[in-house]
A protein has these predicted regions:
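Bacterial N-terminal signal peptides that target proteins for export
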Residues: 1-10
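Extended interaction regions within the primary functional domain
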Residues: 11, 15, 192
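Active-site-adjacent loops and short helices of periplasmic peptidoglycan-processing enzymes
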Residues: 14-166, 175-176
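Domain-terminus/edge residues, biased toward the C-terminal soluble/receptor-binding domains
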Residues: 146-149, 157-162, 166-421, 428-429, ...
């Protein structure tokens, strides 16, 4: 592990220790073999946690179950409701009444993680958020997800939402085993809607060899979550990471766990996923103080560009000794290297039943271009207006926004004050001269 990354992880550990006893035991991590259902590595695997957008895996499961039963098809048109359209980002921004096929909705859901699309699926299948949540919880109970409860289809903050690493691995395994014909949904590198290209928020897709799914999630209270799958030499593994301090750390931790998992073998001593002991904790910890209420740039769901990182050390276990580690882990150092994503051809998605014609695509592109130009013009006008207002003030101190702190290294705040002894009436004289000049020009015309 390089020095900078070690310092970041250590800083997170210290922050977690300061954040309370609930955080002092580290964050959940789990590696499971799909074929056998046996556990290769587990840490706090049954502790309750806020799921954030990995909730959308259960939304997908409920939808695919309806397709399997014949109640829906992948061509079924879903209608965007007022409630769905009103949800906060991440979203597509579809207007109420817009219709979209279920297959396109699922692609957008799993790649873009759009909350308005999740709610559209829920409203059309369950009749309402509560109705769909009841379907989600019924499926969770049937699958044996004993530590999970879902209150909405998207994972936006709600204290009633909770899950565990174990339960999400059960769900991922069910999706893989029960719906093999739809596995391609989970490893789409990017989707394209009109001129917009949206890449998968899963930082392993296109970067980790063999990565083939599934879903990321992030809210301040959960930290950075991921349920990931990868295949190597015919062997399929599921890795769950909950509560990572950043999107990059989430990706790197999952990659390290996969490497160690593929270097380990399952035998009779490995417990089955369903046999993991229950946690003594009843409620999820709130990670907000560690993840969001701290100095620095605002956390982002997607990975920033990552330089390849090598790791020939054990996965840092900074807190807990109650961990089921990989067999022979210390004897098998691994080298985890992640480079930039490989280029992918985005899958086109659209609204309506049929894909748009070339003429319709051109018209849509023109409309989007006009809308973008209008937004830029509005931003420019707003910036110009703010600049004029700032120019009127005698003292001006540039303000660095929270999200720009990472870009502002070396930048200092400058206070502009009137020079001592300067004639305060000078600007007025200048204005008078300008007015006289203007009158002269008017007279000449």
């Amino acid at each position: 592990m390089n020095v900078s990354r070690a310092l970041r992880v250590t800083a997170f550990a210290v922050a977690a220790l300061l954040g309370g006893q609930a955080l002092a035991a580290g964050t959940p991590a789990l590696v499971v073999e799909v074929e056998s259902g046996r556990v290769l590595h587990a840490e706090r695997a049954t502790d309750p946690w806020y799921p954030a957008s990995i909730t959308k895996l259960m939304t997908t499961y409920v939808a695919l179950d309806k397709v399997r039963s014949g109640q829906l098809s992948m061509d079924t048109l879903l209608t965007v409701t007022d409630g769905a359209a009103a949800l906060p980002p991440s979203k597509m921004g579809f207007k109420p009444g817009t219709q979209i096929r279920l297959d396109n909705a699922l692609k957008i859901l799993l790649v873009k993680s759009a909350n308005d699309v999740a709610a559209t699926i829920a409203d059309n299948i369950g009749g309402s958020t509560d109705g769909f949540a009841a379907l989600m919880n019924a499926q969770a109970q049937r699958l044996g997800m004993t530590g999970s409860h879902f209150a909405n289809p998207h994972g936006l903050p709600d204290e009633r939402n909770q899950t565990t690493a174990r339960d999400m691995a059960i769900l991922a395994r069910a999706l893989l085993r029960e719906f093999p014909e739809y596995q391609d949904l989970f490893h789409i590198g990017a989707v394209q809607f009109g001129r917009r290209i949206m890449r998968n928020t899963n930082g392993l897709i296109g970067r980790y060899p063999g990565a083939d799914g599934m879903k990321t999630g992030f809210i301040c209270s959960s930290g950075f979550n991921v349920v990931a799958t990868a295949t190597r030499n015919g062997r399929h593994l599921i890795t769950v990471v909950l509560g990572a301090p950043s999107a990059n750390e989430r990706t790197m931790q999952a990659a390290e766990l996969f490497d160690r998992g593929f270097n380990s073998r399952v035998n009779f001593t490995n417990p089955e996923l369903t046999a993991l002991p229950a946690s003594a904790n009843a409620t999820p910890p709130d990670m907000r103080s560690v993840i969001c209420d701290r100095r620095g740039p605002v956390p982002q769901e997607e990975d920033a560009p990552v330089v390849a990182e090598d790791d020939t050390s054990n996965i840092p276990n900074l807190f807990s000794s109650d961990v089921m580690a990989f067999a022979g882990d210390t004897q098998k150092p691994v080298r985890t290297v992640l480079g930039p994503r490989t280029a992918v051809q985005p899958e086109r998605v659209w609204v309506g039943l049929n894909p748009p014609s070339e003429a319709e695509l051109a018209a849509q592109a023109a409309a989007e271009e006009a809308a973008e130009q209008a937004r830029q013009k509005k931003r420019a006008a707003s910036s110009k207006k703010n600049g004029k207002q700032a120019a009127k003030k005698p003292d001006v101190t540039p303000v660095i926004e929270e999200g720009d702190k990472a870009k502002s290294k070396g930048r200092v705040s400058v206070t502009v004050k009137p020079v001592a002894g300067q004639d305060k009436k000078a600007p007025a004289k200048k204005d008078q001269k300008a007015q006289a000049s203007s009158k002269a020009k008017s007279a000449a015309n």
